Amino acid sequence: MCLVSLSGFCTTQKKYQLKSPDEKLEVNVGIGKNICYSLLHEGNPVIMPSPISMTLADGRVLGKDAKVKRIQRQKIEELIDAPLYKRSQVQNLCNEMILTFKGGFQIYFRAYNEGMAYRFVMTKDKPFEVVNEEATFNLGQERMGYVPFVRGGKGKSMEKQFFNSFENIYTHTQVSEMPSNQIAFTPVVVELDNGKKLCIAESDVNSYPGMFVHAAEGTASLKGVFAPYPKTLKQGGHNNLQMLVTERESYIAKCGGKRSFPWRIAIVSSEDKELLDNDMVYKLAEPSRLEDISWIKPGKVAWEWWNHWGLSGVDFKAGVNNATYKFYIDFAAKHGIEYVILDEGWAVNLKADLFQIIPEIDLEELVGYADSKNVGLILWAGYRAFDRDLEAVCKYYSELGIKGFKVDFMDRDDQPMVDFHYRAAAMAAKYHLMLDFHGSYKPTGLNRTFPNVINFEAVHGLEQLKFASNGKVDQVTYDVTMPFIRMVAGPVDYTQGAMLNSTRKDFRPINEAPMSMGTRCRQLAEYVVFESPLSMLCDSPVHYEREAECTFFITGIPTTWDETVALDGKIGEYIAMARRKGDVWYVGTLSDWKARTLTLDLSFLGEGAWKAEIYKDGVNADRIPADYTRTVIDVPQDRKLFVNMAEGGGCALKIYR
């Protein structure tokens, strides 16, 4: 294949350079007939000269024949408090260059030790419309990438692809072989030379569409794609709970005047494990708008939908009714689980009205019962129903005692839908409600701006195994791929915790009796590996009671952390992650379908005597995935620990003094 280099489209006269604090990363910006940037890491090309611009409806192109008026440089060095994150403080260290242009706009460039970012800023206070944004990532040569194509998007129109749930597995493909008419959501990871990786992401997406990417035909280049602004919508979709776009405008965003635009991010890792522990999306996001966050309580959730309200040995008909939810509340109270969720079914179907409750549910009684047990209730809500009566819903249910909403089926990221996420977050915060966004685009820092947005889906999570076609879904490989890519963007509501575990050959998708792929210990380890401040226990209380030892371990794992250390990992193969809360460490490891032994370096523990409670795959876990052993050992003085994992296996550790 003949590849065309986009660098030929960059005609520059003036050049500006910006280096990272450690000087390993170098950003070069060229200004001439257009504006181009390039990126080097340790002297090696990562992104070749790539044009960037914004085209406005009045015909102006921000970036064409641009003239620099002023250049400003500064070093940013600060610690960001992050009380509901994977570490309690985030270091924000970078060098910044601000180019101010004639015509009323600026471009901010930042060089971090771990990557670079840029954003456009409009300085004129006059309404305008953005027709398109040119965001280019010119790789310069053939590269392999891990690409989350929009599910079902192949051969479809762009419009049909813009309506999607942002849930798919990763395709490992050459960038030049990506169909130019097929889009992928971000983050996307590209393989570089010498084991390095490039991760393309975005942050601070506020009142603007999210960025997809596609391959520029005949090039080794990825280009941004943005959903146009909806012109007309109709109510429909899943149970009449969605707003479907029937026609779009010729522009992607309406803007009121002065504003900043999203950060375009290029993360560079020397080792895969660095992607497991990257903070760029978080630290580039707008700081918190909430002064008081003491009411936001992360934790675990007993969840009924995945296990299909699967109770046995009870004297009532299990389903969407008060008796069933009282059983879940009792289970949560017994095990110190903070919340129980009422998923889809508590409100009258097809009405998109959260004030019409089915007669089998008495919410006031349930809230009182849960409160007496020190358990909070979270309600599922379809997007249209939630947005239509937003303040009335938030006010009423907050006063009733509900702690939050799981809002679902947005399935878009055009500008009005992004606006909804911010509007919902602000209104929920006003009434001290947490939000868990499902059927939503990936996080772009909203959890920093509104910390009450406690989690996001945008993941091919365990729910997919209720319906997956046999042999067509490899969830085990996905589990050791997703954290290097999707989790770079932020927390993930994967909904782990299955107690019915299967081998690859024995897996069956059964809606009312679902199972996981891989071993029991894999499910335990995922509570450590996956960042999830509001973390589901997906299986039935009946199964958890039968597996009391595993349940006790799971319910003791924190959901937010003071420190995170990526110990080891290779994308698509294995992961080892350590996280600390207070003076207790947890370690989780995952493997693909290959049995393997990892040597864990626990030198981060420092001096002193430590014990490790270890849940590891049993000797027969390759045939019986639920087989495991629990041991307690003294951590070796050399701080080296060997971990054996079965095929599709995992290991979970609690390390304490």
What are these regions (language model features)?
Residues 252-331, 335:
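An acidic-aromatic substrate-binding cleft motif
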